[in-house]
Each structure stands twice: as structure tokens, then as C-alpha cells.
Amino acid sequence: MAKDIKFSADARSAMVRGVDILADTVFVTLGPKGRNVVLEKAFGSPLITNDGVTIAKEIELEDHFENMGAKLVSEVASKTNDIAGDGTTTATVLPQAIVREGLKNVTAGANPIGIRRGIETAVSAAVEELKEIAQPVSGKEAIAQVAAVSSRSEKVGEYISEAMERVGNDGVITIEESRGMETELEVVEGMQFDRGYLSQYMVTDNEKMVSELENPYILITDKKISNIQEILPLLEEVLKTNRPLLIIADDVDGEALPTLVLNKIRGTFNVVAVKAPGFGDRRKAMLEDIAILTGGTVVTEDLGLDLKDATMQVLGQSAKVTVDKDSTVIVEGAGDSSAIANRVAIIKSQMEATTSDFDREKLQERLAKLAGGVAVIKVGAATETELKEMKLRIEDALNATRAAVEEGIVSGGGTALVNVIEKVAALKLNGDEETGRNIVLRALEEPVRQIAYNAGYKGSVIIARLKQSEIGTGFNAANGEWVDMVTTGIIDPVKVTRSALQNAASVASLILTTEAVVANKPEPEAPTAPAMDPSMMGGF
């Protein structure tokens, strides 16, 4: 395919036009008085949203050079969303400001490499100052406040704080569509996995068709149990304790299953058998998780253990186990807390090392099950369009809340970025590096400027007063008042603000140092066939 190539100012100008189109579309959503954007969908009803990354992903421009600029900024929003889960609108406004100011200087003859170094130095100083002025987030009320700001709903804030309190900061919180109109919270405490009882005759509650084991022993193995003689010595030992037994195995079949069922029906022995969760290496890891949680040992050839030689020492224990036809929940495992903490640390390091989103998601699930449970926020709404929009907002709020707990919070509404201007301005730089620093100083004002503009106020006036105010005091664009931002609940997670600034500076610097752009030349359309002469149609 033939290529179209542009150089220097032509190349940068074309990309900047794309940056402007995307950023101008997204920035209308910024702040409490931000508007919505309607996105056409190929199928179904249009999507109405104010989520920056969702809008950015939908924008596709006809001009290839402009589209490249737009896609680079879209990448900033996506990257910020991946790292922090929120702040995507700010992440599109900032690169536009840096590119716009930088392009003026590059066009005037400044060295783009020097400017880039200045931008990087200034952003590093800004990030350090953000961390200095950050306040830690702890307690249910503070978490609810962060979530309420991001979702624009106090009720959603309460649900998220309740969920995080119940399942822990590392717990899995999923967002699903409700069948009703109300949004509700459902929490499954303990370790749950998707494997039910192997026989319905193992239930203890015939009405609910569940088996509930109080204070059971737990046998964990990756072997298939077909011969009851393999586990008979162990069963006799458990029988002496008069406590129930949960068997987690690759499978239980042959004579073993009917023998266990028969003893259960006769009341000799309360036992439930389930298949091991997962497959392959993931199954081994999950069985090890269960063993650590319950204080047991996986009976496996990898450790040189055999079922017929197993003793009571390999059995795990828990306060309660509930098994239905589809799932098993282990509550309050008797495992050593330091061993569990060590296992959690290992899984976290694996999450950081993996490049696969699927693997990261599965590791997160394992982490949650070890940490305490799973919470489900079921989103309800009157229409499908409202439901989609609400779901996006809650996802953003959940991510922002996790980010806030991780790195703390700063004043919201762009105030924190203005608060760090003094520290950045104090940097002693020369020449083009100083120009790069000044570009960042101007860009740090941009979110406040746009929030004020969307609310009908003059941005320059707001920024001038903000620079003279104490750190923490800011402008509430919702009602036009000057308030203590944190006390009022107008807050941003440091991780969100930091990620948006760092990613924006990175991509903007790349655009400013671009000297050539290569795009695919559109192929000429094939000529359409001429219409047939009616006289040649045989009189039809």
C-alpha cells in the first residue's frame, strides 16, 4: 500500500488538529456542570456518557494524520484508566494544553528535546509535591465520600464503602446489571469457588438443597478418588472426632462416591464431596490457596504425598462450609494469618509481573478469595441507556476509591494541580528546559480553567484567586462558592491526578519531538459500472 508522508511543522500541525478535536469533545464533560456526550452505536440505542475514555475510544477521524493525533491522546486516557480507573477527562485536557503551548515554541525555533527535558523535570516535581500534600483515606465515611464524588451519587458511595468494608481493599467487587430498577449490594463472605456437590444426596437442607457443614475438616487433593480403601484410614480418624468432612478432589467416582453417599444417608458420617476448582496450573494454585486458608496441605504427588498414607495433619479446617449444586463457600478458614499474608504478597507480585489482562483478572479473583470475599453491586435503572451510563459511573467510582485508599487524596476540581504550581515554578532551569517548565505551569491550570468554563465562570479569574488562597481552599463550580475542598468532599485520588499528569506529559512530549509522520494513502475508489441502456434489455 502506498504511503503518505508529512514532515516537521506540517506533520505536527496535522496531529495537533486531531488532538484538539478529541480533547474538545471530551472536555465538555469535565466538572460538576459538565455536559454529556451522545455516542452512536451500530446496534441498539445510543450511549449517553460523560466518561472520558469511553468517548475517546469512539472517536475515529477521516484524515489519517489527524486520527493519529487523536489516537495518541486516546491512549493517554486508556492508560490512565488502566492504572487509576478514573481521571480520563483530565488526562485528555492536559496533553492538549502541553501540545498547544509546546507547538508555539517549537514553531518559533525552540529545541523540542530541550523542551521535553524541561517538561519531564517539571512533571516529576509536580508529582512529588502532590504526594507531599496528599491525605490518607481510612474509615468507612472517607471511602464513601470519595466514591460519592466520582459517581455523583451518595447512595453509590455508601454501597462501595460497604462493599470495601465487607470484603477488604483487595476483595473482588463486581458490577452487574440488576433485573429490577433498584441498585443493590450483595456480598459473599469467605472463599467461594464454582464447584457444587457431586451428589444431591449429600445435602443437609432438603428445602434449600444446600449442605451446611459446621466446623468441618477439609481434605484437599488433586487426585481422583475411585477406591474408598485409599481414604478409609483417614475417614475412620475423622469419624472418631464426630465432625463433618469436606472432600475437594479432582473427582470422586467408582465405588467411592456411592459408599460416601450411603454413609451420609444412614447418618454414619456427614460428608460432602466436590470437584477441585479451575484447570491445569491454575487448579494447583487454587488448591494451594485453599490449603493455606484452611491450614491444611494439598495431598499431591508433587509433594510426595499419597492418599492412603494421609493423616489428620493434612486436613484443613474452617468455621463453616456451605455447598449448593453450583458453588462452595468456605468461611473463616483456620489457616495461619502470616502464611495467608505471605500468599497474598506472592499473588500481588505475580499481578505486577503479568502482561495478560486475563491472568491479572484471575489473580485478582484469587487474591480476593484469600482476603475475604466477593461483593456484587447490582445496578438497576428505568431504561437500558440509563443503565449503561450508571454502570460506567459506578465502575469509575470503584476504581477511584481503590486508588484513593492506595495513595491518598488531594483537593479535587483541579485545585491540587494549581497548588503544586509554586513548587514547579521554583525549579531553576535554563534555555529550552525553562520553556518546557513554563509549558507545564500553564498546563497545570487547564483543568480548573475548563471546569470553570463549563460552569459559566471565567477561568483566569478563578485561577488568579486560587493561587492566592491557602492549600486546600478551592472553587466549588457546582454552586460558585469558595470552600475547603476536602471538608466539602470535593476530592481526587492522588493516583488519578498523578497518572493523568504523567501520561499526558509523556504523549505530549512525543508529539512535540515528532519530525515525520507516515500514514497509509487512501486507495482510489473503484469506478462504478455505467447504467445499462434500456434498449439493450430485450423489451422488458
UniProtKB/Swiss-Prot annotation:
It catalyses: ATP + H2O + a folded polypeptide = ADP + phosphate + an unfolded polypeptide. It comes from the Bacteria. InterPro entries: Chaperonin_Cpn60_CS (IPR018370), Cpn60/GroEL (IPR001844), Cpn60/GroEL/TCP-1 (IPR002423), GroEL-like_apical_dom_sf (IPR027409), GROEL-like_equatorial_sf (IPR027413), TCP-1-like_intermed_sf (IPR027410). GO terms for biological process: protein refolding. Its EC number is 5.6.1.7. One of its GO terms (molecular function) is unfolded protein binding. It is found in: Cytoplasm. Together with its co-chaperonin GroES, plays an essential role in assisting protein folding. The GroEL-GroES system forms a nano-cage that allows encapsulation of the non-native substrate proteins and provides a physical environment optimized to promote and accelerate protein folding. Forms a cylinder of 14 subunits composed of two heptameric rings stacked back-to-back. Interacts with the co-chaperonin GroES. Belongs to the chaperonin (HSP60) family. This is Chaperonin GroEL. The gene is groEL.
